[in-house]
Amino acid sequence: MTAILERRESESLWGRFCNWITSTENRLYIGWFGVLMIPTLLTATSVFIIAFIAAPPVDIDGIREPVSGSLLYGNNIISGAIIPTSAAIGLHFYPIWEAASVDEWLYNGGPYELIVLHFLLGVACYMGREWELSFRLGMRPWIAVAYSAPVAAATAVFLIYPIGQGSFSDGMPLGISGTFNFMIVFQAEHNILMHPFHMLGVAGVFGGSLFSAMHGSLVTSSLIRETTENESANAGYRFGQEEETYNIVAAHGYFGRLIFQYASFNNSRSLHFFLAAWPVVGIWFTSLGISTMAFNLNGFNFNQSVVDSQGRVINTWADIINRANLGMEVMHERNAHNFPLDLAAIDAPSVNG
């Protein structure tokens, strides 16, 4: 038998680069999506840290009343934030070279746009990188599909909502108290708590937490012991072992008796699909809800819908929410508007019955 060995031609520099980028042997997989992900996320992270520490106040409402957001200008970790780009800029693309000076760029909140646009591109590439690595390893693509939920949520609050409202100044500030401010104002202007898609998102997040805790506790309680009583049950697991590590029949039997038989999964694949799909679909719906409310298709309004035979209003919780919404709307951007839009109309809605 004769073996013929051909000398392999030396690869070009580009070929070696391609092999390195797509190699699954690297400690951290890079991938073609990673080529774009790494610089965009590094840029977003670097600018966020610098701006959170040292950015000067930003004229968010476009009325020459700058709002401070950085640590060096009097904030702490809780109150600090990257202040959104000024309403004077609106939806215009506002890179550094579009401003007359760096001071003007900072005053108009340029860092917010820079961070948000790089961040969204980066997390989208991270999702693509998850798909790419799954493809290289011969896995199914559902990890990237699951990650699409937080990507959709971030895109909704940082991009779709500002587009719908006409200005990046309406985007979510990048900070703790700024996030809560965004939520309160969103409720005041769009009545999000009464939107069915937000309700589905709440069910998804809280339901997902419940199901995760239930699943983890059931599995941990039905481990197949491979150790003595003097050793931890966790020590009996070997990474990559072919045998089941817990008894799904025991877990199914326990839960079936605790609730009822058909409340428990007897198929591990169906169970784990359900655990993944429940929160993901819920967050998808909330993202869709934010994206529709961006264009002022708001939550249900049942204000003063209950009246007696004489036409007098019987106040319900919907009317209480209406009063709260008006109060929150009065308080926000108090120097930019004399009245909230609801109160500035010729015929103001009656809230006293």
From Swiss-Prot:
Membrane topology: Multi-pass membrane protein
Modified residues (Phosphothreonine): T2
Cofactor note: The D1/D2 heterodimer binds P680, chlorophylls that are the primary electron donor of PSII, and subsequent electron acceptors. It shares a non-heme iron and each subunit binds pheophytin, quinone, additional chlorophylls, carotenoids and lipids. D1 provides most of the ligands for the Mn4-Ca-O5 cluster of the oxygen-evolving complex (OEC). There is also a Cl(-1) ion associated with D1 and D2, which is required for oxygen evolution. The PSII complex binds additional chlorophylls, carotenoids and specific lipids.
Described function: Photosystem II (PSII) is a light-driven water:plastoquinone oxidoreductase that uses light energy to abstract electrons from H(2)O, generating O(2) and a proton gradient subsequently used for ATP formation. It consists of a core antenna complex that captures photons, and an electron transfer chain that converts photonic excitation into a charge separation. The D1/D2 (PsbA/PsbD) reaction center heterodimer binds P680, the primary electron donor of PSII as well as several subsequent electron acceptors.
Official protein name in the record: Photosystem II protein D1
Record organism: Coffea arabica
GO cellular component: chloroplast thylakoid membrane; photosystem II
PROSITE patterns: REACTION_CENTER (PS00244)
Top-level lineage group: Eukaryota
Gene encoding the protein: psbA
Sites annotated Tyrosine radical intermediate: Y161
